[in-house]
């Protein structure tokens, strides 16, 4: 401490001595100075001698301890300062230098703090006087250079020292002095030093402000923490903790400050050195006590240390040092902030102690953004959010609601903020000072001052901390001062100024855009875009603008924000859209000719334009990168391209200027917004913006329409709901919308239409003219539109105007009525036209004008001076519309070509001036407007952005690639296209994506129809880009894969040409037909034809050069990259791979269909990718295979065998690999996979291919049987197709394999094959049906029989098998999947095959039923017989008569018997299931025109009943009888009686052929229709002859010769009916009496009669045989009725001689007349037997009466009929009948006999006259004897007649 004092004293002593020693001091005018020095030295000496004890040392102002407040201290300080003050005021440079040097050291070491009040000026502190003194040393340009340096040094020390504090005016003064030294000093070193010092001062001023806020925040945090602890410890009573001594200003409003410092820019003198003059009141802020100062010293030390230690003036490198220091300060700050963050400390958001925690790792700006904790926040700034954190976005919204400028409550929370504000504002004002007229002089003070102020502003902005960025005071300062300054400088013709303005704008855009929405719009619209769009603007300006844009476009946040905030804002310009369009034009090189640029300039500008476009796209990619899924981790295309990461990195454009690069733009968090964008995301709703954008587009479209046709525009806007329908709505629209064409508005308002008039009235009524003089009112009225040309229209408008003017100004006395105003208005219009129109040569004078208006005021005149004033005003300024922006932009059409560069510059400068005015006016207009700015956060915005701008992008890139060979341009275009494709892909915007990919494909030159010409590097690069796109964006390419794969296909061809290798075309192509293409010398090699390269003759040189240029395409990198697309296909997602495969197949198809040279490149690739992708999940794989399989289907059927062979072989290999993977139960992937084999087999007729398919499948079965599951279906399907082939080897191999499967594979892997069991059986059945190979057929049936054994052995396997068809109950599965297919296929074989195979099939089918039927369920049998009965299905039978007949005779016959056998075997199950069907079937059989079948039918009926009758129920018997009845009725041949010959009847046979017998007799020669029918043997029933050729058919063939065809058919049918009738009679007989047959009985009767024996009465018929006992009497009566009906029909026919003759003549049945004798007799015989049996049956007593009645009637009728017979042979036929009848009657009891005998007696007597045979006579004799006895006519000789008489 003592040491410190010593050094101080040493400094002082040396300095004072040095001053005293100066010779100048000796002079008289310095006496005061001399005296002061001496006093001070004396003082020091005394002090040094005192050697005070240590505790008293504090009194000395030591640098290490803050001095104690005590009077002595002040005196001492004063005492020390006075000599120096006087020294500084001396005019001697040496003395001044010495003094300054000492002061600087004293301040630097903290010996001079100047905290004492200034004794000379109340309210100020000593330090203020010290600084003033130092500043005062600068006397303008003539000041000594050494002194200048010392001043700079001292001021820097003062500003940066941590020991002293200066504020407000004093700070300004220090800054101003350095500023002035920079401007005034002629010494370069001093200038540089001054500039560096300024930079450093500003850094410190702003850094302190930021630091203070940070410290305060920490303090608050500690405080809050302590409070919390306190609360935790003593929850009951808590004391308010002492608040820390924080320094606050008295609540001082912004306005106050503005007034105080209003003068800070106004120079009071014209001297340069006053250019920063400031008249700060000294009392401001002086009440800050030093105690508080002391408190913060320690806090500030951290930041200031770095400065105080560097005595920069002694460091030679003036430029560098300040930058280092700045950097170190900034770094230190960041470290402090980030360090705190790292500790995860919670920072309080408000003094109440609400806790708002900041998460770890959050950005430093986050805290600051939350309104610096602890700072007094004004009311307007306290949002009521539920969140405890105050977010900036909410402040913004608050702000936006408050458009009246800065909120009155806002104030500086700390004096340091005020300092910073004042400095900032001063610099802004300095930068706005205008330059002198004429060309700018780089040395002039004005220009240097402007540049310096801009440089310093840029430096402040670039280093701006959180407080600066968020405090409302600073934001308002930026809006009100900086932006206005920029609008002035932004169009400066001085490149450096312009460049600086741009840099500042960039910084603002980067860090402050949320607050500067309107300002940014003005800057873009009025400066950037204007310069780009104006054809006259200079290259330099364009270049700088585009440089700046390069930077803006490289920042994703900015790009998206521009779109969201301007293009989607109804009231803002479409900046993004215009920007892209302008850049696109520049990139295309449009408009550069007018500028007279050099080619080099044009190219560099184009490149920059492209670079911007590419940057924008990159930003969009970057912005939406989260939505992109990169399929590859590694994506380099050879070494030529950087990896995929390049898309997300932005290329660093070279920095715009030397003022420090804006790294923030390139960093990922991009602009300052990035940090708290998350908090703003609430306001960023993409859908909402999209709606806004649509509305905006509608409005713009409406305005465009309006400007062409007003009504159409209005109608459109109304239809779209954007405009109301009332006149008022429309009028308001016309008022407010500035973009409307003023002429059209005028036309619309002037129109005579009723509605238009209403709008016009509303329009005028919306004006308020009150208090305005007439001309002003008229000017206001005519500002908004251009008056229409027609007088009537003007008339209407003026009339309404006049009325409205008077309405608004009702107190006026000038105009008598509205008429006056109307006429005057009209005259003013005429006057303005007259005076200002160039067409009018003779202008109207004032007198003429006054004269013209005579008497218009109700016949009086208006005052002359009034009219005169009007004339003067109009002469001075014409009435015109207000200039809207649109009118000031010179459009191209109006521009005449500028003659010379000089003229152009002149024109441009004028335009720039105009532009600057507009910009400044607009800036000022918006400086108080608060517009809410949305910070975009959603990646969704990119979609509408891209949709909006994709066309100009595409145009720029296409033109670039098309007409420019510069590699850089090409690579930019390609990069742009890549990004565009990426965006279109990510958002699946298909049209746009396809457009870009097509463009890319087009520039590869691979797909052009004209063929490949010479390739340039850009085309090769395009190919590489296309491949890269395929590689990186494959997931999104969809249909665009088509273009890409087409190119790759062509590329392969190109590579072949390039390398000179002959392409591997497929052999056997079309070449053969046209003769060899390589035959003649003039012809090109084939491959060139393939690429469409050559026409007729060939230029070999050209080909060589093409080969060379294409050679590049074969570079290793390209080949590898192409390959990687295919190998990388495994990384595509499930949908993408399907698209990829689909288009690969399409391209392959095109290759193969090439007429000249089919190629298999893509087909090979398909095989490859199939291998690669086989490992995918099955779901994806099956979708892929659906496409590939379909392709193989087509390719496998290609007429070119080589192609098909390749396809089948590839399929085989793939299948083998696929099958190796196996398959789980219930999956169907194998089935889908193997389907192409089926398709090829089905469609390809080539034996080679079919054979190959079968071989492939056979190979699969042999090697992979264990892995096959659902694939069996396809295998059997292929063999099924092979089975019907005519090629022996194919059938043989297929059958061999099928046999192998059925015998061996089924044995081992039965459960795996169940699913295709049906297919196997079906396949076998197909082999069986191939008539060409009978042995195979028989073997196939044997295998089917074998299959049945599997089903029988393994029913469980079927039960457990689950399949798609889950509706089948488990117990039925064995039927549905096992038995049914077998039996069904056998039935198919029966229905389709030749006789021997058919028969074998039938046998096997019934064998299976008989063998396994015991396991069948009832409902299975129903299904089964539905199949079996198909055998009889008439519709399915062959058409040809002979085949049909054969079929019926053989198969149907066989089946019938077999069915009956099965029925009998399984009667219990089948009786109720099957019986009805069997009867129906039998009924069907007898109806067929086939005798054999008909007979079999009746036979079977008989068999079924006889074998099973005992088990029949009553109901079944009813059915049986009904069936018999039906058959009977149907088969009565009624047509025999009704048939009549047609008119054209053939001649009857010649008389010689006709029998000589009388026609009415049934002679021996007459033919019994049944004669030729073989009688059936008694065992016939057991075994029907399988093949017995119908005898009827022979008869029919006999008939054929004589009868015509229609008759033939009829006669044949009639014959069969007759047969059936007879068969039926026999059947009934058999059913009732079997095994007793009628024949046997007849024979017995005859024998007995012959013997006339006594044992005649042996009762044969009492045996219990036949079914008689099971039939009820009613049923028997039914049968009887049938028999008797049949008998009567035969009788009728036999009696109808005429009809029989006619039939005979027509050729029916042989050489003589037909008869029905057998039917007549046998039906009656059977009937009689039944009746007599019932008559004798004790159990049927109830029916006896009826039986007797029937007997009597039948017998009498029969006898009567017998008596009418004339023919001997006919009577002979009745012999047995009579015997039967008489024998039976003889056997009945006497009582009954009586009744009978008396009934027949007369008839029997009549019979005696016939010549009867002996046997009959014997029986008759007995009959009559019996009559005698019974009627007691005679006595019976007992011994003779053993007849019972009961």
From Swiss-Prot:
Q: Which SUPFAM superfamilies match?
A: ARM repeat (SSF48371), Sec7 domain (SSF48425)
Q: Where is this region: DCB?
A: 2-224
What segments bear the compositional bias annotation Low complexity?
Answer: 661-681
What does its activity-regulation comment describe? Inhibited by brefeldin A.
Where is this chain's protein located in or outside the cell?
Answer: Cytoplasm; Cytoplasm, Perinuclear region; Golgi apparatus; Golgi apparatus, trans-Golgi network
Q: Which GO terms describe its cellular component?
A: cytosol; Golgi membrane; nuclear matrix; nucleolus; nucleoplasm; perinuclear region of cytoplasm; small nuclear ribonucleoprotein complex; trans-Golgi network
Q: Name one Pfam family in it.
A: BIG2_C
Which biological process terms from the Gene Ontology are attached to this UniProt entry?
A: endomembrane system organization; Golgi organization; negative regulation of actin filament polymerization; negative regulation of GTPase activity; neuron projection development; positive regulation of phosphatidylinositol 3-kinase/protein kinase B signal transduction; positive regulation of wound healing; protein glycosylation
- Annotated region Disordered: the residues are 216-249, 264-304, 347-410, 631-684
Motif Nuclear localization signal (NLS): chain residues: 708-712
Q: Where does the record locate the signal sequence feature?
A: none
User: Subunit details for this protein?
Assistant: Homodimer. Interacts with ARFGEF2/BIG2; both proteins are probably part of the same or very similar macromolecular complexes. Interacts with FKBP2. Interacts with MYO9B. Interacts with PRKAR1A and PRKAR2A. Interacts with PPP1CC. Interacts with NCL, FBL, NUP62 and U3 small nucleolar RNA. Interacts with DPY30. Interacts with PDE3A. Interacts with KANK1. Interacts with TBC1D22A and TBC1D22B.
What is the name listed in the Swiss-Prot or TrEMBL entry for this protein?
Answer: Brefeldin A-inhibited guanine nucleotide-exchange protein 1
Q: Which organism is it from?
A: Mus musculus
């Amino acid at each position: 401490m003592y040491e410190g004092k010593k050094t101080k004293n040493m400094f002082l002593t040396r300095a004072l001595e040095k001053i005293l020693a100066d010779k100048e001091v000796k002079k008289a005018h310095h006496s005061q100075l001399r005296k002061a020095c001496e006093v001070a030295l004396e003082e020091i000496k005394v002090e040094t001698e005192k050697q005070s004890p240590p505790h008293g040392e504090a009194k000395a102002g030591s640098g290490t301890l803050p001095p104690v407040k005590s009077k002595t201290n002040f005196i001492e300080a004063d005492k020390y300062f006075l000599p120096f003050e006087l020294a500084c005021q001396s005019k001697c440079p040496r003395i001044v230098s010495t003094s300054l040097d000492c002061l600087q050291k004293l301040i630097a070491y903290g010996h001079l703090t100047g905290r004492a009040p200034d004794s000379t000026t109340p309210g100020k502190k000593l330090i203020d006087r010290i600084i003033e003194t130092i500043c005062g040393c600068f006397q303008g340009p003539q000041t000594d250079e050494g002194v200048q340096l010392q001043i700079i040094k001292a001021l820097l020390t003062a500003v940066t020292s941590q020991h002293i504090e200066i504020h407000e005016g004093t700070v300004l003064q220090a800054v101003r002095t350095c500023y002035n030294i920079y401007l005034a000093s002629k010494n370069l070193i001093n200038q540089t030093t001054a500039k560096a010092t300024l930079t450093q001062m500003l850094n410190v001023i702003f850094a302190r402000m930021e630091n203070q806020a940070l410290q305060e925040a920490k303090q608050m945090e500690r405080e809050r923490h302590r409070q919390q602890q306190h609360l935790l410890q003593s929850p009951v009573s808590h004391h308010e903790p002492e608040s820390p001594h924080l320094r606050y200003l008295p609540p001082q409003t912004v306005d106050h400050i503005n007034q105080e410092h209003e003068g800070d820019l106004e120079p009071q003198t014209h001297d340069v050195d006053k250019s920063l003059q400031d008249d700060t009141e000294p009392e401001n802020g002086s009440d800050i006590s030093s105690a508080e100062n002391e408190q913060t010293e320690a806090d500030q030390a951290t930041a200031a240390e770095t400065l105080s230690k560097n005595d920069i003036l002694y460091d030679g490198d003036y430029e560098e040092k300040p930058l280092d220091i700045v950097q170190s300060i900034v770094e230190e700050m960041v470290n402090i902030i980030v360090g705190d963050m790292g500790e995860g400390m919670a920072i309080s958001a408000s003094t109440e102690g609400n806790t708002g925690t900041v998460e770890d790792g959050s950005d430093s700006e986050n805290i600051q953004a939350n309104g610096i904790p602890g700072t007094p926040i004004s009311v307007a700034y306290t949002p009521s959010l539920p969140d405890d954190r105050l977010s900036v976005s909410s402040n913004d919204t608050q702000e936006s609601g408050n458009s009246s400028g800065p909120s009155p409550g806002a104030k500086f929370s700390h004096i340091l903020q005020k300092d910073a504000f004042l400095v900032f504002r001063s610099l802004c004002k300095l930068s706005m000072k205008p330059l002198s007229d004429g060309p700018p002089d780089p040395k002039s003070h004005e220009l240097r001052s402007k540049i310096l102020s801009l440089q310093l502003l840029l430096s402040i902005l670039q280093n701006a901390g959180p407080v600066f960025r968020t405090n409302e005071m600073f934001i308002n300062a930026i809006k009100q001062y900086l932006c206005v300054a920029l609008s002035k400088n932004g169009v400066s013709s001085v490149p450096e100024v312009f460049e600086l303005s741009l840099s500042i704008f960039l910084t603002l855009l980067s860090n402050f855009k949320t607050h500067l929405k309107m300002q940014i719009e003005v800057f873009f619209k009025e400066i950037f875009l204007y310069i780009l769009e104006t054809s006259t603007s200079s290259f330099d300006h364009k270049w700088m603008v585009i440089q700046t844009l390069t930077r803006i476009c490289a920042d994703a946040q900015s790009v998206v924000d521009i779109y969201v905030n301007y293009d989607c804002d109804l009231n803002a310009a479409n900046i993004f859209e215009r920007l892209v369009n302008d850049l696109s034009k520049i990139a295309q090189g449009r408009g550069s000719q007018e500028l007279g640029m050099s080619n080099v300039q044009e190219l560099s500008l184009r490149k920059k334009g492209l670079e911007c476009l590419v940057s924008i796209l990159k930003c969009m990619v970057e912005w939406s990168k989260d939505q992109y899924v990169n399929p590859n981790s590694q994506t380099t295309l050879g070494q030529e391209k950087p990896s995929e990461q390049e898309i997300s990195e932005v290329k660093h454009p070279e920095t715009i200027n030397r003022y420090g690069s804006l790294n923030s733009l390139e960093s990922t968090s991009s602009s300052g917004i990035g940090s708290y964008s998350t908090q703003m995301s609430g306001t960023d709703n993409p859908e909402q913006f999209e709606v806004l954008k649509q509305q905006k587009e509608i409005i713009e479209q409406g305005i465009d329409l309006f400007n062409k046709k007003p009504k159409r525009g209005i109608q459109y806007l109304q239809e779209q709901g954007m405009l109301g329908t009332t006149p008022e709505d429309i009028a308001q629209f016309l008022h407010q919308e500035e973009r409307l064409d003023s002429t059209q508005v005028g036309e619309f308002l002037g129109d005579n239409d009723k509605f238009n008039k209403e709008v016009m009235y509303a329009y005028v009524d919306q004006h308020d003219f009150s208090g305005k003089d007439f001309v002003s009112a008229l000017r206001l009225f005519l500002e908004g539109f251009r008056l229409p040309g027609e007088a009537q229209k003007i008339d209407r408008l003026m009339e309404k105007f006049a009325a409205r003017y008077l309405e608004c100004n009702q107190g006026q006395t000038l105009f008598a009525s509205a008429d006056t105003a109307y006429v005057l208005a009209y005259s003013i219009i005429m006057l303005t036209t007259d005076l200002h129109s160039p067409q009018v040569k003779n202008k109207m004078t004032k007198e003429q004008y006054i004269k013209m208006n005579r008497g218009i005021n109700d016949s009086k005149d208006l005052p002359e001076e009034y009219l005169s004033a009007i004339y003067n005003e109009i002469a001075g300024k014409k009435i015109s519309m207000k200039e809207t922006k649109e009118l000031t932009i010179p459009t191209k059409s109006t521009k005449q070509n500028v003659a010379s560069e000089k003229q152009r510059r002149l024109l441009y400068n004028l335009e720039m001036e105009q532009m600057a005015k507009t910009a400044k006016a607009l800036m000022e207009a918006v400086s108080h407007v608060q517009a809410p700015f949305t910070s975009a956060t959603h990646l969704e915005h990119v979609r509408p952005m891209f949709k909006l701008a994709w066309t100009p992008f595409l145009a720029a890139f296409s033109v670039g690639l098309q007409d420019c060979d510069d590699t850089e341009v090409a690579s930019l275009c390609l990069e742009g296209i890549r990004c565009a494709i990426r965006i279109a892909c990510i958002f699946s915007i298909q049209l746009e994506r396809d457009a870009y990919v097509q463009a890319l494909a087009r520039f590869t030159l691979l797909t052009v129809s004209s063929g490949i010409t010479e390739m340039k590097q850009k085309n090769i690069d395009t190919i590489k880009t296309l491949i890269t796109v395929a590689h990186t964006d494959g997931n999104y390419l969809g249909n665009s894969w088509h273009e890409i794969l087409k190119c790759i296909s062509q590329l392969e061809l190109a590579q072949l040409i390039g390398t000179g290798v002959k392409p591997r075309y497929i052999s056997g192509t079309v070449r053969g037909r046209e003769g060899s293409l390589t035959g003649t010398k003039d012809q090109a090699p084939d491959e060139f034809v393939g690429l469409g390269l050559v026409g007729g003759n060939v230029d070999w040189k050209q080909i060589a050069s093409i080969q060379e240029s294409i050679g590049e395409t074969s570079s290793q990198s390209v080949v590898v990259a192409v390959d990687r697309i295919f190998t990388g296909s495994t990384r595509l997602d499930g949908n993408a791979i399907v698209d990829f495969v689909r288009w690969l197949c399409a391209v392959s198809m095109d290759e193969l269909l090439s007429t000249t040279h089919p190629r298999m490149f893509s087909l090979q690739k398909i095989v490859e990718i199939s291998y690669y992708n086989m490992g995918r999940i099955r779901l994806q794989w099956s979708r892929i295979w659906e496409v590939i399989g379909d392709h193989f289907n087509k390719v496998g059927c290609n007429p070119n065998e080589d192609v098909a062979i390749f396809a089948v072989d590839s399929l085989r290999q793939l299948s083998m690999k696929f099958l190796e993977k196996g398959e789980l139960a219930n999956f169907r992937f194998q089935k889908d996979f193997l389907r192409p084999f089926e398709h090829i087999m089905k469609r390809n007729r080539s034996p080679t291919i079919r054979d190959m398919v079968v071989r492939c499948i056979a190979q699969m079965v042999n090697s992979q049987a264990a892995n096959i599951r659902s694939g069996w279906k396809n295998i059997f399907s292929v063999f099924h197709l092979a089975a019907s082939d005519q090629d022996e080897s194919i059938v043989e191999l297929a059958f061999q394999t099928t046999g192998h499967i059925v015998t061996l594979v089924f044995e081992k892997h039965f459960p795996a094959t169940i699913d295709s069991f049906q297919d196997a059986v079906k396949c076998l059945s197909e082999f069986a049906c191939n008539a060409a190979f009978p042995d195979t057929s028989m073997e196939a049936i044997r295998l089917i029989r074998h299959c049945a054994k599997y089903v029988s052995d393994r029913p469980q396997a079927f039960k457990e098998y689950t399949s798609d068809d889950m509706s089948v109950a488990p117990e039925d599965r064995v039927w549905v999947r096992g038995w049914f297919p077998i039996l069904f296929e056998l039935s198919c074989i029966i229905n389709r095959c030749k006789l021997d195979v058919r028969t074998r099939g039938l046998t096997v089918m019934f064998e299976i039923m008989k063998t396994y039927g015991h396991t069948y369920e009832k409902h299975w049998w129903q299904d089964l017989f539905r199949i079996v009965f198909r055998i009889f299905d008439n519709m399915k039978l062959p058409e040809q008569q002979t085949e049909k007949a054969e079929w019926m005779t053989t198969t149907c016959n066989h089946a019938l018997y077999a069915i009956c056998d099965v029925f009998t075997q399984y009667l219990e199950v089948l009786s109720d299931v099957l019986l009805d069907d069997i009867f129906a079937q039998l009924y069907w059989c007898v109806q067929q025109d086939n005798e054999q079948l008909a007979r079999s039918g009746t036979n079977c009926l008989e068999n079924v009943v006889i074998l099973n009758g005992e088990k029949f129920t009553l109901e079944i018997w009813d059915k049986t009888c009904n069936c018999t009845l039906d058959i009977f009725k149907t088969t009565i041949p009624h047509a025999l009686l009704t048939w009549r010959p047609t008119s054209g009847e053939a001649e009857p046979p010649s008389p010689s052929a006709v029998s000589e017998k009388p026609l009415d007799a049934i002679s021996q020669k007459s033919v019994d229709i049944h004669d030729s029918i073989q009688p059936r043997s008694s065992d016939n029933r057991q075994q029907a002859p399988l093949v017995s050729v119908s005898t009827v058919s022979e008869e029919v063939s006999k008939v054929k010769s004589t009868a015509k065809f229609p008759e033939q058919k009829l006669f044949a049918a009639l014959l069969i009916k007759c047969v059936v009738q007879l068969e039926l009679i026999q059947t009934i007989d058999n059913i009732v009496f079997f095994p007793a047959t009628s024949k046997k009985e007849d024979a017995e009767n005859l024998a007995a009669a012959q013997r006339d024996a006594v044992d005649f009465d042996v009762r044969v018929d009492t045996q219990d045989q036949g079914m008689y006992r099971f039939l009820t009497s009613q049923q028997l009566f039914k049968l009887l009725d049938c028999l008797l009906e049949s008998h009567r029909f035969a009788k009728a026919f036999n009696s109808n001689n005429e009809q029989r003759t006619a039939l005979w003549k027509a050729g029916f049945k042989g050489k003589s007349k037909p008869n029905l004798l057998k039917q007549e007799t046998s039906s009656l015989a059977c009937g009689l037997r039944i009746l007599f049996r019932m008559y004798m049956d004790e159990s049927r007593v109830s029916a006896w009466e009826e039986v007797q009645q029937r007997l009597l009637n039948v017998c009498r009728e029969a006898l009567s009929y017998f008596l009418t017979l004339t023919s001997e042979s006919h009577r002979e036929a009745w012999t047995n009948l009579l015997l039967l009848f008489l024998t039976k009657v003889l056997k009945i009891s006497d009582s009954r006999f009586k009744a009978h005998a008396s009934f027949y007696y007369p008839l029997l007597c009549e019979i005696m006259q016939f010549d009867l045979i002996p046997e009959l006579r014997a029986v008759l004799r007995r009959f009559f004897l019996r009559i005698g006895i019974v009627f007691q006519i005679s006595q019976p000789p007992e011994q003779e007649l053993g007849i019972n008489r009961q």
